[in-house]
Design a protein with these regions (language model features):
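C-terminal terminal-subdomain/extension
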Residues: 59-145
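Compact nucleic-acid interaction/catalytic patches
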Residues: 17-23, 28-68
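Loop/turn positions that initiate beta-strands
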Residues: 4-6
Length: 145
């Protein structure tokens, strides 16, 4: 696995209001041979927190991709990366089956810097650990060789 990629995975979060597990898009960053971090991406279309009035506040916690970043990284719609909430997972080789595409190192450097800035200022949410079993339960791709 490269340093960072876009992954599509079905994940059930405690904050989810309904029981339906939906596919989510993440930027997955390989920290080392044992750990990966997931940062959730989000469409900015028609969302109140991304409108002109709220954008400056939202930018404190999200990296909102420029049109150039959207094009360079294969996103189809305006997208932001949630840098306030980090999901951690132990690395396992089957994880690569959820990979969708690569992202540029320039984007990853910006995102990591933003995550670190948010954390150093105590503005982050508590980290969430995702287990292999949780991913396996909702992502049948992981079970097949």
């Amino acid at each position: 696995m490269d340093k960072a990629s876009v992954f599509i995975a079905r994940v059930k979060f405690a904050r989810d209001s309904n029981s339906q597990v939906k596919p989510r898009q993440f930027i997955v960053i390989l920290k080392d041979v044992n750990n990966v971090f997931f940062l959730e991406t989000e469409s900015t279309l028609n969302k109140r927190k991304f409108n002109v009035n709220n954008r400056s506040k939202t930018k404190r916690y999200y990296h909102i991709l420029s049109q150039t970043e959207i094009n360079q990284n294969g996103f189809k719609i305006p997208t932001a990366i949630n840098c306030k909430e980090v999901f951690k997972c132990d690395y396992f080789p089957e994880l690569i089956k959820l990979k969708n595409r690569e992202v540029t190192s320039d984007l990853i450097e910006k995102v990591i810097a933003k995550v670190n800035d948010i954390r150093s200022n105590g503005l982050n949410e508590p980290d969430v650990f995702i287990t292999y079993q949780e991913l396996l339960a909702h992502n049948s791709k992981l079970a097949y060789g």
